[in-house]
Amino acid sequence: MNRVEEWISQPASRIKVAARADVVVVGGGPAGLSAAIGAARNGVKVILLERYNHLGGLASGGMVLMLDDMWDNHLQEISVRGNMLTLIERMAALGLAVYPRADEWGADPASLDRWTRWGAFDFHTHTKPHPICFAAAFDPDAWKRVALELVQQHGIQLRLHSWFSKTMIEDGKVKGVICNTKEGTEAICAEVVIDATGDLDVAASAGAPFEGGRYMLTTVFRLGGVDTDAAERFEREEPAAFAALDLEVKRILGGSWGLWWLKTPLPGVVWCNCPHMLGLDGISVDDLTTAEIRGRKHIHATVDYVRSKLPGFERCFVVDVAPQTGVRQTRLLQGEYIMTKQDLAERTRFPDSIARGRDYYMPYRVLLPQTVDNLLVAGRHYSATSQAQKMSREIPPCMAMGEAAGVAAALSLQTGVTVRNVDVTALQRILRSQGADPGDQAARNPEIPALARAETVLETA
């Protein structure tokens, strides 16, 4: 039976202008953080709005604790650099991020044995076992800490506990955003707005065309008290018994990737990118509530089972369940160019490429709404088909898009043009000069971050 919709009307109200800036970034996840840094580094005043009490989005609040999709197996190079590598290196310096050294990349048995349970392998390859590659496992609170340090370092005005409500738009041009806070409704005015919400909240509110998308939801969790050495030894020495138990765990979870648990930099703590739940909408309050309730039931049933059956997990306990639901796909921008699965599969290079993912390139046009000016979009809600987005939604390419969007916003203001008319050649040049790889050149990135060469990266964690 269909529910009858009811509506109310509210009188027009005056809204306090809480702040003004050159650029407002809505959403403090990976793309939003990178966008704010990219803009501020290039000399404009930036306000960063975030709904939670921390930065990081799905990286920290969602506890997606593996940074992958930044290694080009065809060219054997690190393909996402810039702000992403800065963040990784700073977390590693704290002993709270680990990744394989350059001499460990590949399918050497010792490397596979050491790194597979960290998730540091190229899961896109068709060969088994998947080769070890450059990928980083990290701690969520390390991300929060380093993100705050970077925001303060670049003079970004941070406004936490600010929920986006509505886009301010006049004559097709975005003028700022309306937020809800504990102090009431507030207006934040800006010359350029960057939508880094993950769900296209700002662009959709402004009337930009989009397509609805849907993919599985996940309530990620961490377990403590795990003897990972014993667990790996059982997996290695009793493969048949392990396979039977592993199959039952996945049945109880209701959905997971091949490896349902992975190591973290914290001793005895593993993270579990599961349970996966299908058929739910990531912007529906009812569906999100269902996911939280259903997910926790799967988690607690799984813990009860592995305590009694799985070597290494006898004394495990739930450390935490991610405070942010793992949403992979909702609204997708239909921008000046729409990325396709074919673009990704064929590794199409574009003249206006401004970011790279694993082995694919992203043109500037995928950040541009069709009908709205002074607005850029960066993150998993970029302009792509549903299938293409599923292949390109990981954190590193989202950070690369964000960095490009931030630099583009600054460049537009400094040259007196709209973001739609930014000189992309100049944008590419700035990105490359500041350590990013916009994908404008086909040459390899031969240099490796200093910490990737170090012998003690893993041992410091």
Pin down the residues of each PLM region.
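Extreme N-terminal leader/targeting segments of oxidoreductases
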Residues: 1-23
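Conserved N-terminal/central alpha/beta ligand/cofactor-binding core
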Residues: 2-4, 20, 45, 51-166
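Core beta-strand elements of the Rossmann-like FAD/NAD(P) dinucleotide-binding domain
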Residues: 19-21, 183-192
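N-terminal Rossmann-like FAD-binding beta1-loop-alpha1 element of flavoenzymes
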Residues: 23-46
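Short hydrophobic core segments
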Residues: 26, 188-198
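Mobile, glycine/GP-rich and aromatic-enriched active-site lid/loop segments adjacent to catalytic centers
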Residues: 104-137, 141-145, 149, 153, ...
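Conserved beta-strand-loop-beta-strand element in the redox core of flavoprotein oxidoreductases
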Residues: 168-187
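Flavin (primarily FAD) binding-site architecture
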Residues: 195-208
